[in-house]
């Protein structure tokens, strides 16, 4: 039987709420991608060019360290991967997560939260961080008032 994991990164809690709803609707396990050093409000100030998030997103080779709480991906076929959109793509900690695990042969379906921007080239950007046999599919932006019934319909369309 195929097993699904919802893995997510949330700096402010918005993506956490969406991920919890997706996991509940999918009957999936939930895993939080945690940075070794939590983000503060100052770190997330996108208007400040010297803020931590601004520096990380400017440097495409930035790979923020993960907190030490591993997940065993071998038991999962599908990973629903959630994150906020930062600068029209995934935060670089998502690359850290992808590069820290073996996703060969797995399907990764993206979902994101955003204050206004879309996925852009996110799927293509992240493909560079996984084995060539991994499939990355752009999913949905989950913004505003989320309804579990709408999430279930989306998951059903995906075959989950």
For every predicted segment, state its role:
Residues 109-146:
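Short, glycine-/small-residue-rich phosphate/pyrophosphate-handling segment
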């Amino acid at each position: 039987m195929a097993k699904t994991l919802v893995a997510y990164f949330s700096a402010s809690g918005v993506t956490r709420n969406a991920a919890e709803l997706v996991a509940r609707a999918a009957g999936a396990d939930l895993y939080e991608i945690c940075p070794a050093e939590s983000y503060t409000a100052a770190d997330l100030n996108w208007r400040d060019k010297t803020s931590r998030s601004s520096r990380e997103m400017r440097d495409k080779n930035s790979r923020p360290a993960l907190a030490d709480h591993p997940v065993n991906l071998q038991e999962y076929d599908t990973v629903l991967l959630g994150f906020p959109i930062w600068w029209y793509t995934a935060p670089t900690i998502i690359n850290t997560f992808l590069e820290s695990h073996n996703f060969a042969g797995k399907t990764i379906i993206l979902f994101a939260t955003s204050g206004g921007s879309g996925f852009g080239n996110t799927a293509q950007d992240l493909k560079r961080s996984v084995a060539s046999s991994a499939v990355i599919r752009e999913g949905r932006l989950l913004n505003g008032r989320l309804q579990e019934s709408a999430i279930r319909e989306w998951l059903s369309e995906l075959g989950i």
